[in-house]
């Protein structure tokens, strides 16, 4: 009995001492272990890294030297924590080197970001704990993605090139350091996909070094270092055969990139036979390869046994930039949309500006989770998405091809290789500068395309009282559809197939909902110059205005204008109201306003260019016409027949307060001729009464289409539509020179027009009260205005 009591007292004493020695950290560890046994993982341990407190969420990966955990900070931000226990001094130095490299490359978008680190040395156990807090890449490694795809759904060429491009940019950042840093362990396990940034990133820099080995004198030292820090199947020949006496430097990474590219494509290592196969550079592309010849040539370009002949990382990126083809653009993974763009060459211009609505949603694929020792994340195998980028698309040719093994559908997206350099780089350019490694505006949801080929052979002509000749023979198709883009595209769509057939680049998208004026004509000239000089006179070619003809003796109601002495003023005034965008031919791209006449009063100016301009309300234009009797009204609200002629005639007309014209009318229809224009206002049959005369202009709104385009009819019946028989205004004659020539008398009932200098008051037909930024004035025959509150002029002539 006494022995039992003695044993009990000793037990209680030991237990009490144990309880007193338990620290809070031990309690946390024990609780975490218990909770881990319940949930299947060790969860709950708290770490303090450089003042940042993080808590374990789950175990992500486990390797021979440590573990990778998913952790959460106090602000619910997720990170990857790499925890290692190291006893060898060489391994500890390698970890310190990895931390140093990651700190240098911390801000590179293709390098896994190091958030913090902590090194705890235990002198008693001679073991060192290394903690590295890094950004969490939830997409897993490339190995995880390939395994999840399986044998029969291998990576597509555009996907491989997307991954490869990001990896090359990460390697470029390392090789640009002084001295250059060689990764020396590039493989698919060390490439992670980060879904939040939509990028592939390099990790595991434990093998990286700035050392350069001259194997002739440092053979033994190099051999130990290579065997410890590199993987056999990715080693370059100079690393395998040290007796070659070749220098081992950063070009070993280029060789490893070739092996990585080969394995992503064919799921096998190119040199799985070992050292002898590497030394002989003996690899074979499978006969059943589904990839293009350009892809095979890319592998051959990289895998060069002699390091002195092997390309550098800059050469590799330049080669990628060359073979991509500047006239081909990005692809679409799951849907195809044919987008026609504007190609304005010197001789032919097909203006099919079709902005088609695109909705590309990536397919989600449920795949098993596979972790690797080098991964700091769990894979999420949904196809990565990327949004649109703003760019300038300057192309010469555009073709559309169907789906083939070597091509994939086009997409209204920027090509990924535009990231590598300037977008205007041609397919044959070879820049010595390294391309840009940033992919900007990933979350920008609007695509602004600017398809302008400034290849016009225009003679430099004087705009004042000169006859101008244009060397462009243009054929224009008047098809302009203005729709909205809604893009949600796959990241891999940024790549073309690299096949033997070029792909169509995306069509221009007009994100501005302001005024659209299409300069659509049968044989006009393209005013594409970036300045006001050398554009020629806007009125030197009557075909630019279609129905604008010279004075005639017989014809329908005509605005007859002699443009021989026309003054064209290229004003620099811009306004914050409606914008006149030329979407058909991208003409008048100069940043200046164009108006007829050099004299402008306070009423404002009708502008037409691609800059912002205003259409002021209640403006009066002096047409210098002398009606001898009051004319009946014309109602052009039917939007048909000669009303279309009216709208197309005013495509390029800039009416200022000093514009002038004379009016004559007769029974026939005028023919086109040079140096003048004609506006045919033929009333519809529904607007005539029983006697054949025209009905009064009605005040009802007329629907042009489902978007409820409203005609600018008079809403105030108390105002007069008649001509203003005020004193003749001759001040404008000096502004327009001989802009108006009196036409010979013609008969239509008793109507005669014989002399100028009377004002035509267009106040009632041009008065707009809505917000100009929401208006759309589209003076094109075949224009579909999808913007609300679109207004078309309805001229009531009395």
From Swiss-Prot:
Residues 679-697, 717-769 have a biased composition (Polar residues). Residues 330-538, 553-645, 659-798 are annotated as: Disordered. It comes from the Eukaryota. Keywords: ATP-binding, Kinase, Nucleotide-binding, Serine/threonine-protein kinase, Transferase. Residues 54-324 form the Protein kinase domain. It catalyses: L-seryl-[protein] + ATP = O-phospho-L-seryl-[protein] + ADP + H(+); L-threonyl-[protein] + ATP = O-phospho-L-threonyl-[protein] + ADP + H(+). The active site is at residue 185. InterPro entries: Kinase-like_dom_sf (IPR011009), Prot_kinase_dom (IPR000719), Ser/Thr_kinase_AS (IPR008271). One of its GO terms (cellular component) is cytoplasm. Its EC number is 2.7.11.1. It is an enzyme of class 2 (transferase). Residues 335-406, 429-490, 506-538, 557-603, 611-642, 659-678, 698-716, 770-790 have a biased composition (Low complexity). ATP binds at residues 60-68, 82. GO terms for molecular function: ATP binding; protein serine kinase activity; protein serine/threonine kinase activity. Belongs to the protein kinase superfamily. Ser/Thr protein kinase family. This is Probable serine/threonine-protein kinase DDB_G0276461. It comes from Dictyostelium discoideum. The lineage of its organism: Eukaryota, Amoebozoa, Evosea, Eumycetozoa, Dictyostelia.
